[in-house]
């Protein structure tokens, strides 16, 4: 297999400083296509040239050299247009030797959603409200009385889902393994003093929100959130992989995560500590353990294939229906995806973001999910995993990657991919 000379890795210290994969000169040799599931793009209202432009943008993203594996699924009008993969599950990470045994990724390769898990966890909560089990406007302390300490008695589930609960992190905790201990995490959050009260400020809650939500599910329904997910969503939807964590059998097929881009930058480490409570390197060490996938981390460890993530969002587009079953009511989805407020500066991430109760929202003239995507909703995971639906374009999309670029030249390719999808899938005439 040839290697593109333009992306060949430098040796020695430079290779340790800039992490990139070896990109094959012939990327068709590392491409997987589930042709049995894909339709003719014309059947989904996409011209062949437009479809090819999308795929070329996915290939360009892989060619940046920052992603050992890319899995991509796009549905339009309910039909699968792309269900494909590029790269390797293992054997071609930046620090792997050139002759390391290589395992190709496939369209059905599972990968971790990281923070994109939050949107799915949010729908578990909205489903409970739909069935009268809780009220999202109730204070969290209504369900977890000990959470009321330090003035948090009026902080609601609504505030938590929209990243306005004032507990974006756990002060003084530097060991990322605390997320593996639900009871300890819950105790620390109940004892925590909020940074602000009554939802006055938006600060992205990277991990903390999921701990509280999981405890509410357990106390109200009597089930842990993994069992609730399986009972209410996974089994009725016929999902085989999408779940909190992963079994040993699923984990054996998963992508191996790798840090890519510039390494050793103190600014990146400082940002990660502020958002995640640990550096990206420390997070990756945790993610590389079996304990991480045995645990239930509602804000960050759901595992899925690209097709199943796309299927979940297609269910939302279809008014809550999947496989002939009503999983959610249409009005529940409408409430879940309704904006909480306009784009505001997020005090954790440091950029303007717009949220609903559980989803990141698109924008005008350009947003997280492409151009003119004001009504799109979804979530990103560690910046590069992107899952979303755009009702005006009738698309449900999942882009899963195994590389975690820190400072790298990947953002332009990612933006161009989003723009290509927006261009190839125009908004309906009623919304244009």
Predicted feature locations:
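Short, surface-exposed loop or secondary-structure junction motifs
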Residues: 150-371
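Short, gly/Ser/Thr-rich active-site loops of penicillin-recognizing serine hydrolases
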Residues: 318-321, 328, 332, 337-345, ...
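Short, well-structured active-site flanking segments
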Residues: 81, 106-108, 120, 126-145, ...
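Active-site SXXK
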Residues: 52, 58-59, 78, 109-138, ...
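Short, well-ordered beta-strand elements
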Residues: 81-82, 387-388, 394-403
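Short Gly/Pro-enriched turn/cap motifs at secondary-structure boundaries
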Residues: 61-63, 347-351, 375-380
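Short, conserved catalytic-motif segment at the N-terminal edge
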Residues: 44-111
């Amino acid at each position: 297999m040839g290697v593109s000379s333009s992306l060949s890795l430098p040796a020695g210290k430079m290779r340790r400083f800039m992490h990139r994969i070896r990109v094959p000169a012939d990327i068709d040799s590392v491409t997987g296509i589930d042709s049995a599931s894909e339709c003719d793009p014309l059947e989904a209202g996409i011209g062949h040239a437009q479809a090819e432009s999308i795929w070329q943008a996915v290939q360009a993203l892989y060619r940046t050299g920052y992603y050992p594996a890319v899995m991509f699924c796009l549905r339009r009008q309910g039909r699968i247009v792309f269900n494909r993969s590029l790269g390797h599950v293992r054997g071609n990470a930046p620090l792997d030797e050139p002759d390391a045994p290589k395992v190709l990724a496939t369209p059905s390769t599972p990968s971790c959603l990281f923070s994109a898990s939050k949107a799915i966890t949010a729908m578990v909560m909205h489903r409970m409200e739909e069935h009268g089990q809780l009220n999202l406007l109730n204070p969290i302390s209504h369900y977890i009385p000990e959470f009321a300490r330090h003035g948090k008695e009026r902080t609601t589930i609504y505030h938590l889902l929209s990243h306005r609960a004032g507990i974006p992190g756990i002060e003084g905790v530097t060991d990322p393994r605390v997320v593996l201990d639900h009871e300890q995490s819950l105790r620390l959050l109940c004892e925590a003093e909020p940074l602000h009260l009554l939802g006055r400020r938006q600060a992205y809650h990277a991990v903390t929100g999921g701990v509280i939500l999981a405890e509410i599910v357990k106390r109200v329904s009597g089930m842990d959130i993994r069992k609730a997910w399986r009972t209410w969503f996974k089994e009725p939807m016929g999902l085989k992989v999408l779940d909190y964590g992963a079994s040993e059998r699923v984990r054996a097929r998963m992508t191996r995560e790798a840090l890519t881009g510039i390494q050793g930058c103190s600014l990146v480490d400082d940002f990660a500590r502020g958002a995640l409570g640990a550096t990206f390197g420390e997070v990756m060490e945790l993610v590389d353990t079996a304990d991480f996938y045995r645990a239930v981390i509602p804000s960050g460890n759901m595992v899925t294939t690209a097709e199943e993530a796309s299927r979940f969002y297609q269910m939302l587009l279809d008014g809550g229906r999947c496989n002939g079953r009503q999983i959610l009511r249409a009005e529940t989805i409408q409430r879940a995806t309704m904006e909480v407020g306009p784009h505001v500066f997020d005090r954790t991430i440091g950029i303007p973001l717009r949220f609903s109760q559980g989803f990141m929202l698109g924008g005008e003239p350009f947003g997280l999910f492409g151009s003119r995507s004001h009504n799109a909703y979804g979530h990103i995971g560690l910046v590069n995993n992107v899952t979303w639906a755009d009702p005006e374009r009738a698309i449900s999309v999942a882009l899963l990657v195994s590389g975690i670029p820190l400072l790298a030249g990947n953002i332009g390719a990612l933006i161009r991919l989003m723009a290509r999808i927006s261009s190839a899938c125009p908004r309906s005439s009623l919304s244009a």
